[in-house]
Amino acid sequence: MRNFTLSICVVFFSVTVKAQLTEKIETDRPDQTESPYTVPKKWFQSETGFAIENDKSGTKAFAHPTMLNKYGLSKRFELRLITEFISFQTPVIIPQGNDIVTGLQPIEIGGKLALLEEKKARPKISLIFHTAIPKTASKQFQQTNWVPNFRFTMQNSLSEFISLGYNLGMEWYGEEETKPSFIYTFAPGFNLSEKWYAYLEVFGFLNPDNHPQHSVDGGIAYNFSNNTKIDLSGGFGITKNTSLKNYVALGFSFRLPVEKY
């Protein structure tokens, strides 16, 4: 833990002092709404989060951590790699306590392509796509099939201090007989000051074989510099059949140039 903390401090210092862009870092966390902004060309960006999620069946999920790494391949396209190390704690009545399963979820690879810039009422639009690779997971989390997902991510600037982000997309599952779910998110964001940001959000999943699942969340973020950011968020399910009971998450993001620009 001491070495991990020291590494974070070194990264924080280096990206704060040595690498500066005039724009603040744009991240896909902490909300469920992905950002339409891509990483600058020849820059690397990492977004790391830790989360605790409770569902209504009594199962707890611990993400420790989930990590999204990005690289700006061009002005309009970024490569993306998602890894998630997770533990599930299920409520069972045994003398030793609850049953816990820990491991790596299937690694996701993909990209983000900037499609349109914001113009009057037209939002800034990008396309994000991933696929999960079955055999890259720990044995207990491996799936038979590749698992794709995509979403269009959009954002309108309502004023200097308020923006509106929203996503529409689909995600598939590892079982052939399961139909894909439609994804939606809707998140107004507020620039509270030069360094503070807050958001509120509604998001959900619609599947032909299941009841709609709708949830709300909110959070805050603080920019230490243009290239470093921390965030805190939480949310809960709002419909009867939503599996999510509540969650809380904490994250840290940074970016730095891979080559001189």
Residue ranges and their predicted role:
Residues 1-23:
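Bacterial Sec-dependent N-terminal signal peptides
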Residues 20-261:
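Transmembrane beta-barrel domains of Gram-negative outer membranes and organellar outer membranes
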